[in-house]
Amino acid sequence: MQLVESFLSIQGEGKYNGKLAIFMRFAGCNFNCLGFNVKISKNDKTLIGCDTIRAVFTKDFKESYETLNANELLKRVIKLKKDFDPIVVITGGEPLIHYENPEFIEFIQMLLKNKFEIHFESNGSIEIDFDRYPFYKECIFALSVKLQNSGIKKDKRLNFKALKAFKNYAKDSFYKFVLDANTLDNSFLEINEILKEAPNQIFCMPMGENEQNLKKNAQKIAEFCIKNGYNYSDRIHIRLWNDKEGV
């Protein structure tokens, strides 16, 4: 498995924000969200995407990844855990592109055997076969379903069958939407469409890869939540550490 980074921090987003957490970020994604417009220069070219570009553009960053097997991944988690009791956040990229990978499966099962609480951060577009892989029912899924502002085509980013499966089978699941203050009317329509087809808890977050851009959106997103009865989630890690990686 290609590991982009691993670190102990706090969960900065969604229903469980503020929780002590070990983050295990795996390489690879099925989306490239150009609409988020985060830019990084690499190998004499400009890469455009979300705030986890290093995990998405695997060809450009592969030399910085670690290749670890399931046992080595577990050892990393135990080392980061120290004597604490953190949750383990499996993130990316899109970690569920690996959900049928034998090495990945072994790692997740090892974590569960060692009594870790596992949270997946996913875009919700990949349907898990919960009958074939029932251990995923013991996990929590934070579903960052992409809206029009991501730049991804609708038929690719919305998989209602997958979203219903997370709600019906997982230990817990919820939506976390990244919203731009300039496109709230469209976002409202999209969110309602998703809720109609696949109801779940909602947490709305302001778009912004750094503290300055986050601040531009935050108040309007909070007011949008109050107006429409949604939960607001700030992005604590950006508030505290701006755009620093590995925190």
UniProtKB/Swiss-Prot annotation:
Binds 1 [4Fe-4S] cluster. The cluster is coordinated with 3 cysteines and an exchangeable S-adenosyl-L-methionine. Pathway: Purine metabolism; 7-cyano-7-deazaguanine biosynthesis. Its EC number is 4.3.99.3. S-adenosyl-L-methionine binds at residues 93, 144-146. Its cofactor is [4Fe-4S] cluster; S-adenosyl-L-methionine; Mg(2+). Residues 16-243 form the Radical SAM core domain. CDD domains: Radical_SAM. It catalyses: 6-carboxy-5,6,7,8-tetrahydropterin + H(+) = 7-carboxy-7-deazaguanine + NH4(+). It comes from the Bacteria. InterPro entries: 7-CO-7-deazaguanine_synth-like (IPR024924), Aldolase_TIM (IPR013785), rSAM (IPR007197). Substrate binds at residues 10-12, 25, 91. Pfam families: Fer4_12. GO terms for molecular function: 4 iron, 4 sulfur cluster binding; carbon-nitrogen lyase activity; magnesium ion binding; S-adenosyl-L-methionine binding. Belongs to the radical SAM superfamily. 7-carboxy-7-deazaguanine synthase family. PANTHER family: 7-CARBOXY-7-DEAZAGUANINE SYNTHASE. Catalyzes the complex heterocyclic radical-mediated conversion of 6-carboxy-5,6,7,8-tetrahydropterin (CPH4) to 7-carboxy-7-deazaguanine (CDG), a step common to the biosynthetic pathways of all 7-deazapurine-containing compounds. This is 7-carboxy-7-deazaguanine synthase.
